[in-house]
Structures are given as structure tokens and as C-alpha cells.
């Protein structure tokens, strides 16, 4: 697991700006063990922080000239320090160093020693977060504002007196930067600027390398490089609340010459909502009360940091290769402090912006979030036991996770070649623009998704409202239909009653005529009986023929008169019989017509309901056609309404 114990450190060259004369260097080796891991036994001692009590190395390690432990990646000249320049700007040595200096003492390349690091390089451009080449020079802060310029760290200030009196040599450059390294730790920057001599270096060494001595990490080790954090926090000029040029990541140098660092602090408020409350709180503390409160032992609780990392670390992107187990030990230190870089003067917007920081869509990808090369520059976090990864050239974006080890090696070497050819600035700018466009694309996607959700909710609300209106209209139509049916029935009953009332007068007249006819018949029958029974026919009756003739003649006259009257009544009776027969036929027809009328009334009610429904549907169809000509298509299709 501890690969750094077997590696050698590449030498660092002094900066041409402050250290023009290249001093002689003596090869030294240094062995670094993890601060938060149990120390593992090594075959030879390691080289501690610069002090006079540095242990000597074995003959096999001394035989390799200009080799040092790769974990620290710095070289110390033996020239005395200059009083006017306590530290030199950080310069990238990945371009100046030959390929042989990057080899180990065993002759193997770094990718053969760090397979997990090389594997993460091959997939760094395939995940949603793109790695940016970080080998660049440190830019000095603009001298426009005197109170915001970077000042040397507290360790440098404390050791300057010992340097000028005891040892006379130039200060070493502050932690050179190479493509294999990310942002340097603040502890490394202060360590490079310390002299070798002095009894106080042993105490600092004890705090810096606790795994070697066996001591515990105290609060002093958390406050070693606080002035550097103060420099970075005070070196950030505050501008207006707008984004302005802060989105273009002005702290990334695009040329070898140093340029002023212009960075607005409004990005902290703009992007502060994307980071966990712990990091936002620490960033505000660093801006108000300096770096003493930013990295103090009381402000950064390990449980809080672990919770923030667990909340900010997303799931790995599908298709990306999981990170090696050797990197998981320092996940919290490298991922939490990404937005708190202070040693290089990078503004908080670089660590907290959605394009590089811990945005919800990008987060900590396995190729970047688990790599210590993009970690923070705070001294309170332990150094990783494995060498940090380096970014891949953007021209190798098409590499897949199934690339072999040889293709990964070719990609890394091609990136170094491109850096030597001067293509790094354009690559950084292209990657930065790509991230800006990707962030804009994510913002648009979010806005479109939110608009679609709002429209979907509005459509559901409109559909529900239309359905409720349709239901109310249907109930109202049913009520109106029932009222119309009742009214039609009442009209038919009134018409039937009027017809029956006209027939009742004739029926009453028929009863009167029948009584008169019966009375006349009774009188005729009684007269005939009287005339027949009163004639004497037997018993020796004698009658006068003349008087009998006259009586018979009078009886015949009466009978003729009665016959004539009967014939007249008979004609009337026949006419009455005909009328009664016709009345019976009419009554029969009336009963049949009443049955048909009932059937027609029932069918009329059904047809009336269908007519009302069709008219309502026609009205709604015309309205929808009119709305289609003015507005977009209807939210609710017509087929959803179950019309009767």
C-alpha cells in the first residue's frame, strides 16, 4: 500500500526569477509515511523535513544521483537565502526534467509503480468531470492592493533569523509542481522555505512526520502553515457581486511568465450554495478572521468532515472504473478541502464553482474526487501514502476504460510532449470553456425540466378542472332533461283531459235521449194491451156492427198512428244505434292511440336527451376549434371525456 517508500523524489530547479544562479545540489532521499496510517517498516529510513539531524541513506540510494522521494517532489539548493526574497514562486518542472529523472531507482516508470493512478488517468476524461493539467507556475499576486499581497508563512518568518545568522544560503523554491502532482499542500510550501539547521526544526519535524516518531497529531500540526492560508485569503481582491471574469479561472497561468492574480470573491457567495455548510462556514471564517480560524483544530471536526464527504460524494458514473483501494484512505482530506486551496492564491470560486467543485451534477468523480492530486493545500490533512495522480491531455479524451497499460503510458508521455510544445495553455482554456458550456447545458436542462414539471402540474390541474366542469355540466343537463320530460308529460295530460271533456257532453245527452225513448215505448205497449183485452169476443155478446166497425176503425187509426210514430222513432233509434257504434269504434281507436302516444312519449324523451347531449358536444367542439386557432393544442384530448 505504501508505494511512496520505494519511490525517489524528482529534483526541483530554482526559479529563474529570484534564484538566477543555479547552486550545487547534493542528492538526498526522503521517505514519507502516511500521517493517518500506521507506519509500515521499511528497509531503509526516510528523509525527514529539512534539518541537520537528517539520517543518511544507504549506499544503493546514494548511488542514484539527483534522486529524492517522489512524494514531496522538491529539491533544496545549498545557496544561502536572500534577505529580500524569502521564497520563490512555484514553477513547473515537468517540462524541464528529462524522462530519466522520472524513473525510479529500480528503473521502472511511475505508471508501472502506480497502476491505480495510471488507471484513473485513462478514465479521467471519460467521466462527467474532465481533469485539467495542473502543472503550471505560481503567479504572484497583483500589487495593486498592498494589504492583499501574499506574505511568507509563519514558519518562514520564524526561521529567517536562524537562516541569516547560522547558515548562509539561498531559500529553496516553494514546492515545484509537476503534472504528476495536483495542488501542493501548504505544509510542503512552508517546508521548502525552512532552513536545514536549527533545533526547532526537529520539533516541527515531529509534528510533520508523526508516524515516524510515533507521536500523535496535535493542534500545532494543524496550524503549521496558517499564514499561507491568510495570504491566499487576503490576496483575493473583492469585486462586485457579478460573475465577471471570475468564471474564466484567472488563477490558471497560460504562459511561463508570472501574471497578477485577479479573482473576485463574489464567486464564494455565488457558488457557496453548492458546497456543504462546513466548507462555506470555513471559507467565511477565513475571509473574516484570517487563516488562524480557518484551519484551527476546533473549527474542523473530523466527524463533521466525514459527514460532509459522505454527503457530497456521489455514486460513480456508469462505465467509469472504480478508484483503487489505496486512494480511499485519504478521501475525506482530499475531497473536503478541494474548495479551500490557499497556498496558490486560488480564489474560492475555483474550488467551489460547479465546473470544478462539488456540484450536484458533477460531484466527485472516481477519477478526480478520489485523487489527491486535486486535493487542497491545507496543512491539517495528511499526505497520501500513494503518489497522487496527474491529469491527462485533453487530446486523450477518446480513451476508454478498457485501455491497456501501454496506451495509458503513451497518453501520459504524449501529454508531457504537448506541454513541451506549448499546448498546455490552449488545452486548459479549451477544457475550461468545455466545462463552462457543460455547466450552461446542465443549467438549461434544469430550467427545462423545471418548466416541464410546472407545465405537467398545470396540465393535470387543467384536466382535473375540465373534468369537474364536465361532470357539473352533465349533472345540470340530466336535471334539465328530467324537468323537460316532466313538462312534456304535463302537456300531454292536459290535452287528453281537454279531449275527454268534449266527449262527456255528448255522453250526457245520450243518457237523456235514452230515458225519453224508454218512456215512449212503455206508453205504446200499454195502449196496445188495453185495446186488445177490452174487446168482448165470447159469452154471447152482442154488439152493434156499426158501432163495432166504428170502434175497429178508430182502433186501426190509432194503430196506424202508433205505427207511423214507431216508424219515425225506429229511424231515430237506428240513427242512434249507428252513432253508438261509431262511438264505440272511436273509443277503441282512442285507446290504441293512447298506447301509441305513450310509446312516442318514451321515445321522445330519449331522443330529447340525445339531442341535448349532441348539441352540447357540438358547442364544445366549436369552442375547441376556435381555441386551437388561437392557442397551442389542448392539454386534454377529447377522447378522455366519456360522452354519452
Swiss-Prot record:
Biased composition (Polar residues): 31-43, 141-157, 184-193, 350-380
Low complexity bias locations: 49-69, 124-134, 245-259, 318-344, 399-410
A biological-process GO annotation: cell division
Record's keyword annotation contains Cell cycle: yes
GO CC annotations, alphabetized: microtubule
Keyword annotations: Cell cycle, Cell division, Microtubule, Mitosis
Quaternary structure and interacting proteins, as annotated: Part of the augmin complex composed of 8 subunits. The complex acts on microtubules and interacts with gamma-tubulin in spindles and the phragmoplast.
Family, similarity comment: Belongs to the QWRF family.
Protein function: Contributes to the assembly of the acentrosomal spindle and phragmoplast microtubule arrays as part of the augmin complex.
Listed name of the protein: AUGMIN subunit 8
Amino acid at each position: 500500500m505504501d508505494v511512496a517508500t520505494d519511490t525517489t523524489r524528482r529534483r526541483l530547479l530554482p526559479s529563474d526569477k529570484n534564484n538566477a544562479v543555479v547552486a550545487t545540489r547534493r542528492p538526498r532521499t526522503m521517505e514519507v509515511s502516511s500521517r493517518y496510517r500506521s507506519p509500515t517498516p521499511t528497509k531503509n529510513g526516510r528523509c525527514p523535513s529539512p534539518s541537520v539531524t537528517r539520517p543518511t541513506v544507504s549506499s544503493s540510494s546514494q548511488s542514484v544521483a539527483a534522486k529524492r522521494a517522489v512524494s514531496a517532489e522538491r529539491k533544496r539548493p545549498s545557496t544561502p537565502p536572500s534577505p529580500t526574497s524569502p521564497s520563490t514562486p512555484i514553477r513547473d518542472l515537468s517540462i524541464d526534467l528529462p524522462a530519466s529523472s522520472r524513473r525510479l531507482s529500480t528503473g521502472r516508470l511511475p505508471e508501472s509503480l502506480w497502476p491505480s493512478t495510471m488507471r484513473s488517468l485513462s478514465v479521467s476524461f471519460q467521466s462527467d468531470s474532465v481533469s485539467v493539467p495542473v502543472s503550471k507556475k505560481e503567479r504572484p499576486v497583483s500589487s495593486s492592493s498592498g494589504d492583499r499581497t501574499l506574505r511568507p508563512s509563519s514558519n518562514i518568518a520564524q526561521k529567517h533569523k536562524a537562516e541569516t545568522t547560522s547558515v548562509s544560503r539561498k531559500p529553496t523554491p516553494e514546492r515545484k509542481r509537476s503534472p504528476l502532482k495536483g495542488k501542493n499542500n501548504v505544509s510542503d510550501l512552508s517546508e521548502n522555505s525552512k532552513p536545514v539547521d536549527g533545533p526547532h526544526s526537529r520539533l516541527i519535524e515531529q509534528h510533520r512526520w508523526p508516524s515516524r516518531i510515533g507521536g500523535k497529531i496535535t493542534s500545532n500540526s494543524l496550524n503549521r502553515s496558517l499564514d499561507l492560508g491568510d495570504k491566499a485569503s487576503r490576496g483575493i481582491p473583492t469585486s462586485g457581486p457579478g460573475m465577471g471574469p471570475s468564471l474564466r479561472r484567472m488563477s490558471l497561468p497560460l504562459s511561463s511568465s508570472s501574471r497578477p492574480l485577479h479573482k473576485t470573491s463574489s464567486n464564494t457567495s455565488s457558488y457557496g450554495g453548492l458546497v456543504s455548510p462546513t466548507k462555506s462556514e470555513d471559507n467565511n471564517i477565513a475571509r473574516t478572521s484570517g487563516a488562524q480560524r480557518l484551519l484551527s483544530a476546533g473549527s474542523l471536526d473530523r466527524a463533521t468532515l466525514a459527514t460532509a464527504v459522505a454527503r457530497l460524494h456521489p455514486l460513480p458514473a456508469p462505465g467509469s472504473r472504480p478508484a483503487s483501494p489505496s486512494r480511499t484512505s485519504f478521501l475525506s482530506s482530499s475531497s473536503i478541502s478541494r474548495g479551500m486551496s490557499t497556498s496558490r492564491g486560488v480564489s474560492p470560486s475555483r474550488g467551489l464553482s460547479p465546473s470544478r467543485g462539488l456540484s450536484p451534477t458533477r460531484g466527485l468523480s472516481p477519477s478526480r474526487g478520489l485523487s489527491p492530486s486535486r486535493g487542497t493545500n491545507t496543512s491539517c490533512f495528511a499526505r497520501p501514502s500513494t503518489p497522487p495522480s496527474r491529469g491527462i491531455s485533453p487530446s486523450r479524451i477518446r480513451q476508454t476504460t478498457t485501455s491497456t497499460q501501454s496506451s495509458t503510458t503513451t497518453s501520459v508521455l504524449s501529454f508531457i510532449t504537448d506541454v513541451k510544445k506549448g499546448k498546455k495553455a490552449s488545452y486548459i482554456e479549451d477544457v475550461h470553456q468545455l466545462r463552462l458550456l457543460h455547466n450552461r447545458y446542465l443549467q438549461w436542462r434544469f430550467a427545462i425540466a423545471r418548466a416541464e414539471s410546472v407545465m405537467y402540474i398545470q396540465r393535470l390541474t387543467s384536466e382535473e378542472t375540465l373534468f369537474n366542469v364536465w361532470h357539473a355540466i352533465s349533472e345540470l343537463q340530466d336535471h334539465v332533461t328530467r324537468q323537460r320530460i316532466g313538462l312534456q308529460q304535463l302537456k300531454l295530460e292536459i290535452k287528453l283531459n281537454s279531449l275527454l271533456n268534449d266527449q262527456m257532453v255528448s255522453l250526457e245527452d245520450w243518457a237523456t235521449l235514452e230515458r225519453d225513448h224508454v218512456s215512449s215505448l212503455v206508453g205504446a205497449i200499454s195502449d196496445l194491451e188495453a185495446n186488445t183485452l177490452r174487446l168482448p169476443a165470447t159469452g154471447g155478446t152482442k154488439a152493434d156492427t156499426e158501432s163495432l166497425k166504428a170502434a175497429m176503425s178508430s182502433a186501426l187509426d190509432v194503430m196506424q198512428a202508433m205505427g207511423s210514430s214507431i216508424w219515425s222513432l225506429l229511424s231515430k233509434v237506428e240513427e242512434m244505434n249507428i252513432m253508438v257504434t261509431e262511438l264505440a269504434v272511436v273509443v277503441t281507436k282512442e285507446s290504441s292511440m293512447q298506447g301509441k302516444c305513450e310509446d312516442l312519449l318514451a321515445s321522445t324523451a330519449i331522443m330529447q336527451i340525445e339531442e341535448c347531449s349532441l348539441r352540447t358536444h357540438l358547442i364544445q367542439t366549436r369552442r375547441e376549434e376556435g381555441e386551437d386557432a388561437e392557442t397551442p393544442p389542448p392539454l386534454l384530448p377529447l377522447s378522455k371525456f366519456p360522452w354519452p
